Amino acid sequence: MIYDSQVYTVLLIALLASVLAIRLGSTLYQ
């Protein structure tokens, strides 16, 4: 079974990873 806490944790990790990737990409682009 998948608990809501696990889903939220995965979503938070994915969100943080996307934000870090965007910041890294923008830094390398500059």
From Swiss-Prot:
It comes from the Eukaryota. It is a single-pass membrane protein. The keyword Chloroplast applies. It is found in: Plastid, Chloroplast thylakoid membrane. GO terms for biological process: photosynthesis. Keywords: Chloroplast, Membrane, Photosynthesis, Photosystem I, Plastid, Thylakoid, Transmembrane, Transmembrane helix. GO terms for cellular component: chloroplast thylakoid membrane; photosystem I. It holds the Pfam family PsaM. InterPro entries: PSI_PsaM (IPR010010), PSI_PsaM_sf (IPR037279). The chain crosses the membrane at residues 7-29. Disulfide bonds: none annotated. Belongs to the PsaM family. HAMAP family: PSI_PsaM. This is Photosystem I reaction center subunit XII. It comes from Trieres chinensis (Marine centric diatom). The lineage of its organism: Eukaryota, Sar, Stramenopiles, Ochrophyta, Bacillariophyta.
